[in-house]
């Protein structure tokens, strides 16, 4: 499965209902499992983002659907990046000669 990094910002609604955050995170984990993906790690962070999530999914389409479903709830906005492992990085570089 491919690895993805999601950079998360709380919306005003998300901040106002922050005490429900752990429950929403549990629901997100289940949604990932139901989609054949896995939410591997979640971090509350400081700086320009509020949280970071690391996930694995079978393809970009699955991650896009999960991101859109999450955004539709109105509590967070995400920016998701496809992350390449060191092995993938080395293979990509080797393939360009």
Regions found by a protein language model. Give the residues of each.
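A compositional/biophysical signature of low hydrophobicity enriched in polar/charged and small residues
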Residues: 1-97
